[in-house]
């Protein structure tokens, strides 16, 4: 990946011209490397469900963004999710920061496969 590409991916969620969806959901792409991407989210009241923990939709969205960004480090074309599933192993804390790390596991033809792990502070 070129440095220009790296900067473009990092700036996609921050600063002028940032993707509105990521900004609205408080997500920032904080690191990218060939086949990996890190997305962070400082939890806000609108990120939480009625039990005070991060809403499952927030976690799913973070996973999708991190996985897609990881694929974009290897491909120059637009990517989109064909299929996705998630397993919630435990509830995240309702304060602090969440970190999602997307990793490409396999690419070929027009498809790529990735996984994302999300952790709280």
What are these model-derived regions, one by one?
Residues 1-121:
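Terminal targeting signals and extreme-terminal segments of soluble enzymes
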């Amino acid at each position: 990946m070129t440095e220009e590409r790296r900067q473009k991916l990092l700036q996609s969620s921050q600063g002028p011209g940032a993707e509105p969806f990521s900004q609205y959901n408080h997500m920032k792409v904080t690191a990218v490397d060939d086949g990996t991407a890190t997305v962070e989210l400082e939890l806000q009241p609108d990120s939480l469900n009625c039990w005070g923990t991060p809403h499952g939709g927030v976690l799913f969205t973070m996973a999708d963004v991190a996985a897609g960004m990881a694929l974009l480090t290897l491909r120059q074309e637009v990517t989109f999710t064909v299929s996705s599933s998630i397993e919630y192993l435990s509830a995240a804390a309702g304060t602090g920061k969440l970190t999602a790390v997307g990793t490409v596991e396999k690419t070929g033809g027009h498809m790529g496969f990735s996984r994302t792990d999300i952790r709280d502070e």
